[in-house]
From Swiss-Prot:
Residues 191-193 form a propeptide. The gene is rhoad. It comes from the Eukaryota. The modification Cysteine methyl ester is found at C190. This is Rho-related GTP-binding protein RhoA-D. Regulates a signal transduction pathway linking plasma membrane receptors to the assembly of focal adhesions and actin stress fibers. Its main location: membrane. One of its GO terms (cellular component) is cytosol. (Microbial infection) Glycosylated at Tyr-34 by Yersinia ruckeri toxin Afp18. Mono-O-GlcNAcylation by Afp18 inhibits RhoA activation by guanine nucleotide exchange factors and blocks RhoA signaling. Belongs to the small GTPase superfamily. Rho family.
Length: 193
């Protein structure tokens, strides 16, 4: 039986951990060096609920310089991973300010999984000290859950690509969300207007 094909697009602020999450899931290795993404695609096979799914993983650039290029990733998307970083309250603030309006404009009716990346840094002393200097603290799990409700996300999960904690669960939830959509509506993929 041929695998079902689904397209996943990951969005979020620059340096919030999008590429590491995709690479750890698809290649099982953590990249130690940060290289800003322009456009990358990966393919990963995943089995959920006895279904074989070939997941096309579309990485995007979070930096503002790419705001006009990013929409080219959106057509025919089945699920969105919308990411912020637990060590960056500002990246969580950009979820309703920037990412939700953009995604809902180009991908109406496409399920969104809100993902808190870098959860290993929540209790990291160096991270906490740096945030205190800016009168901030790491994002709490309940703040992530509240945001997921606020943007009507399909679900909320936290993970650490570095420790691999929660990575598989993110993609299992995303795959389930992508599979569910098709039952309701035959063709509700992204539109480019």
């Amino acid at each position: 039986m041929a695998a079902i094909r689904k397209k996943l697009v990951i969005v979020g602020d620059g340096a919030c951990g999008k590429t590491c999450l995709l690479i750890v899931f698809s290649k099982d290795q953590f990249p130690e060096v940060y290289v800003p993404t322009v456009f990358e695609n990966y393919i990963a096979d995943i089995e959920v609920d006895s279904k074989q799914v070939e997941l096309a993983l579309w990485d995007t650039a979070g930096q503002e310089d790419y705001d006009r290029l990013r929409p080219l990733s959106y057509p025919d998307t089945d699920v969105i991973l919308m990411c912020f970083s637990v060590d960056s309250p500002d990246s969580l603030e950009n979820i309703p300010e920037k990412w939700t309006p953009e995604v809902k404009h180009f991908c109406p009716n496409v399920p969104i999984i809100l993902v808190g990346n870098k959860k290993d840094l929540r209790n990291d002393e160096h991270t906490r000290r740096e945030l205190i200097k800016m009168k901030q603290e790491p994002v709490k799990p309940e703040e992530g859950r509240d945001m997921a409700n606020r943007i009507s996300a399909f679900g909320y999960l936290e993970c650490s690509a570095k420790t691999k904690d929660g990575v598989r669960e993110v993609f299992e939830m995303a795959t389930r969300a992508a599979l569910q959509v098709r039952k309701r509506k035959k063709r509700s993929g992204c539109l480019l207007l």
